[in-house]
């Protein structure tokens, strides 16, 4: 079956955009094919710094014919309806339509629309130009004289050529007749800009990928990554060193080269006095190079791995020397930052934070630090931390933001603060908290274990959330400019991973009170936000979101650890036959109550009359007794936080509830008896509310 080959060659595409662009190209083209009724066997997208490529295998040469029957208005319908039907069906007159008879509704017009299958080549030529014109680059540009014209082509970098062919593997494929921005599709591409700048004639994918390989272009980004990684490991091993692997840097570097050549450079050993993290940040950020460790050690070696896009005639000596000069200059800067920063104590830097605005409505960083310190001191006893150490750590936690090193490398915030604090003799817990108070940064990041770190981390995140809630800067849809979802997830993970008992409303209130002179946060709304984040977090671990809703619907549910334990007990209960049947009985009772309360215009929320129930049917009396006992037992179990015991108490209701619905008529002719039986159903609803709001549970 025929294949499609598409290449869009341009000036250098930013590395961070390449992989997403390749996937976008595949999705746009395959979606367009499927929408037009064309199926295919497989599709692969590729990217290099200078091209996006797509190969779709197993396309039909021609689409299948389509026969569609479209029913129109009733015979004798108004003229406007008839004309609308004819226009929609593409018919010139009713003579081209037939009629069908519906035994119940009468005679109707019917249009039989037959569309012959179209040549795949024609269909591709129809939609490919529009895909190129509307391609979803995060940033794009116009260029050349045509850029002044309205609607001129936009691309991430100037587009230079298009290869677009379609045909069977065993025959010479045809060029798809497309032209975009004055660039007509053809069969000519180019290899490596410097190593093989000559034109290459290609026809089909197998020819294309082999021709590029000969022209010093590795088309597959994952293969380029593999080449870089293994060559770097081998080169390091040959020198008795270990590569410090960096997936993010590897991904970026593989997008900077079409023909990766791995080389090793070195720097003066005196630079190893600089913290290893600073050396790595310097070499990574400025030169896109990998650092190395001494063999079998955690200590850095005075060497680095660089990746060139050239096969140099001198074996890469000039390229390596050039990189070494730049690395030496950058490390000299880093050493200056390190020595300069060590000369000033962290607390002496705090006045500078008073001049840095955190947010125009939330004051300066200095004001924020004062709030975090007060909150950390208050939280400390609740998490087993020393209040004085927690307050001290919070006061110093942001001081490194005004150091030279963090000013140059913001990603080192916290880490450099920890090192400077250790040098000035701070307590180990204070040092750890300065680095760890930013954690956890995501669902898989490590959660701090030191109580002082936990206190400061909670204070930092709660202050952020309460502050932005107070000024109504909440996340909306996909927008979360202040990373409030991440902050809430951080609080949740700190509480759950460390088994902390905290009343969130109380802590939000404390954070709120520290925002003196500013409007307070809506604590209930913020608690709802925590509930949403908790649902996302637990759902990823297999928990049911409706059970979380059912627990949060109860009053006073701001102790997240207890919420989760209650959810776990509820899930275990509902997995049993007793749980499933009780839920079904609850749903039936709630449905009856809803109907009768709506009909009567009143709520049946009074306690049932025990004497009246005792005088009624045996099943009625048994349910009344079981409800009273189960509610009392469940309430006591919840009070001592024995949620499994509470569920066990509810499980005793299964048999009497089943018997009640089987043997008792709720809507009895006697009004008093009917009212009391409805009150019994309400008592069932009230009993289940001891553990959760069953109305929120699905199923």
Swiss-Prot record:
InterPro entries: DALR_anticod-bd, Gly-tRNA-synth_bsu, Gly-tRNA-synth_heterodimer. The keyword ATP-binding applies. SUPFAM superfamilies: HD-domain/PDEase-like (SSF109604). GO terms for cellular component: cytosol. Coiled coil: none annotated. Its EC number is 6.1.1.14. It holds the Pfam family tRNA_synt_2f. The keyword Ligase applies. It catalyses: tRNA(Gly) + glycine + ATP = glycyl-tRNA(Gly) + AMP + diphosphate. One of its GO terms (biological process) is glycyl-tRNA aminoacylation. It comes from the Bacteria. It is found in: Cytoplasm. Keywords: Aminoacyl-tRNA synthetase, ATP-binding, Cytoplasm, Ligase, Nucleotide-binding, Protein biosynthesis. One of its GO terms (molecular function) is ATP binding. Tetramer of two alpha and two beta subunits. Belongs to the class-II aminoacyl-tRNA synthetase family. This is Glycine--tRNA ligase beta subunit. It comes from Methylobacterium radiotolerans (strain ATCC 27329 / DSM 1819 / JCM 2831 / NBRC 15690 / NCIMB 10815 / 0-1).
């Amino acid at each position: 079956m025929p294949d499609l080959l598409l290449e869009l060659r341009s000036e250098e595409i930013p590395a961070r955009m390449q992989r997403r662009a390749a996937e976008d190209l595949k999705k746009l083209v395959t979606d367009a094919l499927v929408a037009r009724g064309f199926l295919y066997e497989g599709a692969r997208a590729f990217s290099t710094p200078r091209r996006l490529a797509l190969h779709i295998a197993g396309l039909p040469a021609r689409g299948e014919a389509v026969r569609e029957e479209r029913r129109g208005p009733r015979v004798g319908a108004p003229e406007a309806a008839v004309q609308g039907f004819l226009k929609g069906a593409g018919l010139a007159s009713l003579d081209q339509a037939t009629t069908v008879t519906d035994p119940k509704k009468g005679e109707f017009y019917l249009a039989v629309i037959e569309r012959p299958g179209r040549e795949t080549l024609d269909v591709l030529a129809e939609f490919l130009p529009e895909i190129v014109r509307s391609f979803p680059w995060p940033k794009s540009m116009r260029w050349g004289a045509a850029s002044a014209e309205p609607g001129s082509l936009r691309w991430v970098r100037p587009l230079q050529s298009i290869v677009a062919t379609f045909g069977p593997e065993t025959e010479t494929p045809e060029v798809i007749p497309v032209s975009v921005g004055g660039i007509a599709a053809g069969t000519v591409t180019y290899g490596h800009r410097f190593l093989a700048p000559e034109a290459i004639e290609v026809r089909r994918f197998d020819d294309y990928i082999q021709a590029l390989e000969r022209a010093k272009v590795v088309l597959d980004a994952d293969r380029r990554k593999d080449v870089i990684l293994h060559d770097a490991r081998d080169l390091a091993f040959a020198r008795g060193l270990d590569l410090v692997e960096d997936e993010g840097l590897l991904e970026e570097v593989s997008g900077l080269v079409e023909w990766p050549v791995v080389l090793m450079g070195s720097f003066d050993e005196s630079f190893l006095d600089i913290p290893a993290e600073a050396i790595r940040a310097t070499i990574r950020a400025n030169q896109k190079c990998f650092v190395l460790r001494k063999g079998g050690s955690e200590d850095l070696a005075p060497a680095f791995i660089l990746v060139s896009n050239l096969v140099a005639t001198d074996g890469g000596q000039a390229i390596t020397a050039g990189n070494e000069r730049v690395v030496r200059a950058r490390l000299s800067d880093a050493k200056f930052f390190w020595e300069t920063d060590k000369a000033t104590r962290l607390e002496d830097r705090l006045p500078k934070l008073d001049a840095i605005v955190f947010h125009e409505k939330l004051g300066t960083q200095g004001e924020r630090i004062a709030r975090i310190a007060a909150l950390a001191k208050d939280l400390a006893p609740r998490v087993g931390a020393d209040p004085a150490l927690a307050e001290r750590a919070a006061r110093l936690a942001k001081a490194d933001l005004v150091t030279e090193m963090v000013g140059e490398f913001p990603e080192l915030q916290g880490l450099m603060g920890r090192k400077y604090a250790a040098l000035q003799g701070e307590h180990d817990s204070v040092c750890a908290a300065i680095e760890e108070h930013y954690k956890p940064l995501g669902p898989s990041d490590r959660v701090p274990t030191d109580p002082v770190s936990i206190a400061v981390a909670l204070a930092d995140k709660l202050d952020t959330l309460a502050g932005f809630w107070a000024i109504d800067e909440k996340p909306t849809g996909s927008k979360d400019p202040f990373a409030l979802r991440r902050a809430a997830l951080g609080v949740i993970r700190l509480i759950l991973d460390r088994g902390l008992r905290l009343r969130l409303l109380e802590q939000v209130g404390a954070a709120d009170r520290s925002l003196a002179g500013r409007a307070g946060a809506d604590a209930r709304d913020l608690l709802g936000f925590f509930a949403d984040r908790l649902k996302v977090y637990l759902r990823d671990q297999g928990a049911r979101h409706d059970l979380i809703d059912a627990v949060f619907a109860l009053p006073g549910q701001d102790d997240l650890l207890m919420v989760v334990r209650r959810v776990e007990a509820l899930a275990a209960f509902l997995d049993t036959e007793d749980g499933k049947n009780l839920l079904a009985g609850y749903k039936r009772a709630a449905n009856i109550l809803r109907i009768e309360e709506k009909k009567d215009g009143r709520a049946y929320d009074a306690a049932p009359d025990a004497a009246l129930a005792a005088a009624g049917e045996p099943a009625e009396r048994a349910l009344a007794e079981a409800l009273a006992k189960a509610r009392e037992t469940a309430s006591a179990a919840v009070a001592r936080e024995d949620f499994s015991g509470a569920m066990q108490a509810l499980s005793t209701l299964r048999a009497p509830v089943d018997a009640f619905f089987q043997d008792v008529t709720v809507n009895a002719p006697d009004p008093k008896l009917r009212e009391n039986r409805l009150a019994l159903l309400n008592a069932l609803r009230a009993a289940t509310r001891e553990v959760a709001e069953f109305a929120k549970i699905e199923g």
